Swiss-Prot record:
It is an enzyme of class 2 (transferase). Specifically methylates guanosine-37 in various tRNAs. The lineage of its organism: Bacteria, Pseudomonadati, Chlorobiota, Chlorobiia, Chlorobiales. Belongs to the RNA methyltransferase TrmD family. S-adenosyl-L-methionine binds at G112. It is found in: Cytoplasm. GO terms for cellular component: cytosol. It catalyses: guanosine(37) in tRNA + S-adenosyl-L-methionine = N(1)-methylguanosine(37) in tRNA + S-adenosyl-L-homocysteine + H(+). InterPro entries: Alpha/beta_knot_MTases, tRNA_m1G_MeTrfase_C_sf, tRNA_m1G_MeTrfase_TrmD, tRNA_m1G_MTases_N, tRNA_MeTrfase_TRMD/TRM10. Keywords: Cytoplasm, Methyltransferase, S-adenosyl-L-methionine, Transferase, tRNA processing. HAMAP family: TrmD. The keyword S-adenosyl-L-methionine applies. This is tRNA (guanine-N(1)-)-methyltransferase.
């Protein structure tokens, strides 16, 4: 997978792209991630990328010219499956979308900044708008990292245990179950006996039931009409 990130603060990504899962994916050759400084496509002596909004109002708006120049340059070199814009008013980013994106080849992720980006960018260049929650951040850089982490961990070979990602929360429409490790008893708190039994079918059944109980307690809307009956 190849991912192009467009940002006004490219240095933000220096450490995350070298450490953790993103660094592993790159070192294994399973992902290419390139960061592009939007100011390199800015206007004039000071490489301006933003301006005041028409009609007045607080904040600044990213101009269309730098974004068009950057994305069109990338698209002239190769084709991209999606041009993703990280924005609070986008579609909710969830595990289903992460699964779908993990099957793509080339992605462009545009990180918003300032008050907004010019609407003509969204109407013409952007193919997917994603939000990581009902909260406003200072820019799209942190959400972009969240998307990349969620997507790349699903690519075969990135995680040491390939099955681990397939049993995470949301993969089967439920939250994940409770997990335990050694010691079997800690400060009077014991691991459920079934997990020590060695009976794989019973263990799997316990995990499914526990996952459903946790989902009903913490995120009942995920169970839909079934939770309403209960």
């Amino acid at each position: 997978m190849r991912i192009e990130i467009i940002s006004v603060i490219p240095d933000f990504f220096a450490s995350p792209l070298e450490k953790g899962l993103l660094g592993i994916a790159r070192r294994k050759g399973l992902a290419e991630i390139h960061v592009h400084n939007l100011h390199d496509y800015g206007l004039g002596k000071y490489q301006q990328v933003d301006d005041a909004p028409f009609g007045g109002g607080a904040g600044m708006v990213i101009r269309p010219e730098p974004v068009f120049a950057c994305i069109e340059k990338l698209q002239a070199e190769r084709s991209y499956d999606e041009v993703i814009f990280m924005t609070p008013d986008g579609q909710a980013f969830d595990q289903k979308r992460a699964n779908r994106l993990s099957r793509k080849g080339n992605l462009i992720i545009l990180c918003g900044h300032y008050k907004a980006i010019d609407e003509r960018i969204r109407r013409t260049l952007v193919t997917m708008e994603l939000s990581v929650g009902d909260v406003v951040l200072s820019g799209g850089e942190i959400p972009a990292l969240m998307v990349m982490d969620a997507v790349l961990r699903l690519i075969p070979g990135v995680l040491g245990d390939g099955e681990s990602a397939l049993t995470d929360s949301f993969q089967n429409e439920l939250l994940d179950c409770a997990w335990y490790t050694r010691p079997a008893e800690f400060r009077g708190m014991k691991v459920p006996d079934v997990l020590l039994s060695g009976h794989h079918e019973k263990i799997e059944l316990w995990r499914q039931e526990n996952a459903r109980e946790r989902t009903l307690e913490r995120r009942p809307e995920m169970l839909g009409k079934e939770s309403e009956k209960e």
